[in-house]
Amino acid sequence: MENERVEREQSQFQEDEFIDSRKPPPWRKQITVRAIVASLLIGIVYSVICLKLNLTTGLVPNLNISSALLAFVFLKSWTKVLQKAGIATTPFTRQENTIAQTCAVACYSISLAGGFASYLLGLNRRTYEETGVNTEGNNPRGIKEPGVGWMTSFLFVTSFIGLVVLVPLRKVMIIDYKLTYPSGTATAVLINGFHTSKGDKTAKKQIRGFIKSFGLSFFWAFFGWFYSGGEKCGFSQFPTFGLQALDKTFYFDFSMTYVGAGMICSHLVNLSLLFGAILSWGIMWPLIARLKGEWFPATLKDNSMQGLNGYKVFICIALILGDGLYNFVKILFFTGRSFHSRLSKTNSISTLVEVPEDSTKESDNLKRENEVFVRESIPLWMACVGYLFFSLVSIIAIPLMFPQLKWYFVLVAYLLAPSLSFCNAYGAGLTDMNMAYNYGKAALFVMAALAGKNDGVVAGMVACGLIKSIVSVSADLMHDFKTGHLTQTSPRSMLVAQAIGTAIGCVVAPLTFFLFYKAFDVGNQNGEYKAPYAMIYRNMAIIGVQGPSALPKHCLELCYGFFAFAVAANLARDLLPDKPGKWIPLPMAMAVPFLVGGSFAIDMCIGSLVVYVWKKVNRKKADVMVPAVASGLICGDGLWILPSSLLALAKVRPPICMNFTAAH
């Protein structure tokens, strides 16, 4: 379904008679100073947004389309201002737009996938204490406090190797196998659409919509700050459905970030979140809380992993693992079947680069795209030398940072990385699903078990980061190569842009994280910045070390049940006809509110409701404007984080505490 939609969109922009057919500029001229500046600014803003989303719920929508729109807005405005000032400037091309978008995505992807809210943050003392100092397997040797220096070094050591691991196979995967990479194709469709006469008019409407929603969101966040001068104060604690519902986390917290995210995510994701919130906070946790004294000691603290909090964390993990394992096996199956069928074709050589015969224009476009993509190749020796160099650096540096992870474990990880990266990138090209987190979780369990009780927690989480980083970056690069292929952008300039963005991200991400870490109460399970995945990853490592003995009473049986439910739900959605199948909830989305509460699920559903009503009133306008308006809501609220965190660091507190109590 997704692939068919993308192919329809692709054919639409290829049919536009006004599409830019000029010869692409040389690859060095595609990388401009203004594109790097634009990507730096977008990367910083989106790094803040990604970290806020990661540290609050861990659920982050795909922001690639949004970043392409912002890159167009920034560079188009730049060229127009200079032209009005009478300053000569080079034309703004779709290749430059692609470079800016690629560089920006590479930058904020480090904040998104760098482990700041999961496996790296899970090493700190607070998460160790929240997990339970008396929990077997939760060794005090497994503590490493966050630091700008070691985090930046770790990112530089681990983030670049994924850029070179699959470079030799780019032609095979993009041209020969014709993998669609739906997200990369959709981004290319958007960028190509901008650079047409019709697309320019549409872009102006989107820019106006973005500016209005951005202003509204930023002003609302600024206004709401004045009323949040204390714990559980402000509009974020507004008892929309009453005080009892507020205690169960069911309320609208006026977060424009999550309303915007809900507009981007599908209705199924948002409804799955709400279903998970109702099932957990509305039914299960109140029932289990009544069993205090029977299932777990009544004297335990609320945050004890042997009490109610343990059920929240481990059942959430069971859903995540069940969903992840099913999709992992499914993607491997489809990848293997597709790969085998291609290899078994006797006439594969003649059909690999076949050109459509029904449209001369489409045929010419495809020829130009393939020609540009193949002409400016990246030398094989460069990729091999780069992989060996970064592997050697990692094998030396990572055991120095983390003595618990021995050098030979790092060596094994890098020997396995190319094959794992290929499987993941091939699967992502078919399904648009990046399974890097599941490869990382597999590495976590294996390494935690191998390293033993004393070193297992740290070794497991760091190994998870190594594998996930390589596998994720290589798949993202293939998405970018697909975008570059369809916008006739040189692979060399794409790789350089990705490297520049990654380098910027390795500096920006730790600094942005420490803005949150110093200004806000990160890791407080009763606060806004719960960092749920730090707790989840540390507990997964403990399970890897200890096995099921780490779980509270009857929790293992519940985990088995929810693991089976996750597998069954995915199986039902794949096997049932489309009509009933589309209503089966997504276990991965259901799992998030199990730990963090239901308020953000209500925000997301309100975003979904806005999109639903808008499409009922004017579907054509909604299809054009929803991404722009949603991006504005996310960026406005996200940008307010910068001044609010600086005020918090300066000890400037909001003047008013608005909260609500019962009248009697």
From Swiss-Prot:
GO terms (BP aspect): monoatomic ion transport; response to iron ion; response to zinc ion
Q: How does it sit in the membrane?
A: Multi-pass membrane protein
Q: Keywords in UniProt for this one?
A: Cell membrane, Ion transport, Iron, Iron transport, Membrane, Transmembrane, Transmembrane helix, Transport
Q: Which InterPro entries match?
A: OPT, YSL-like
Provide the transmembrane region boundaries. 31-51, 55-75, 103-123, 147-167, 209-229, 268-288, 314-334, 378-398, 409-429, 457-477, 496-516, 549-569, 594-614, 629-649
Induction profile: Inhibition upon iron and zinc deficiency. Not regulated by copper. Subjected to diurnal regulation.
Where does it mainly reside? Answer: membrane
Query: What is one cellular component GO term in this UniProt entry?
Result: plasma membrane
Task: Explain the consequences of disrupting this gene.
Answer: No visible phenotype.
Expression by tissue, per the entry, reads:
Expressed in roots, leaves and weakly in shoots. Restricted to the veins, to the central cylinder of the young roots and to the pericycle and the endodermis cells facing the meta-xylem tubes in older roots. Expressed in the vasculature of sepals, petals, anthers, stigma and siliques, but not in developing seeds or in meristematic zones.
Q: Where in the cell is it found?
A: Cell membrane
What Pfam families is this protein classified in?
OPT
| GO molecular function terms listed in the Swiss-Prot or TrEMBL record | oligopeptide transmembrane transporter activity
Which family does this protein fall into?
A: Belongs to the YSL (TC 2.A.67.2) family.
Instruction: Name the PANTHER family on file.
Output: METAL-NICOTIANAMINE TRANSPORTER YSL2 (PTHR31645:SF44), OLIGOPEPTIDE TRANSPORTER YGL114W-RELATED (PTHR31645)
Q: What does the UniProt function comment say about this protein?
A: May be involved in the lateral transport of nicotianamine-chelated metals in the vasculature.
Protein's name according to its UniProt entry: Metal-nicotianamine transporter YSL2
Q: Which organism is it from?
A: Arabidopsis thaliana
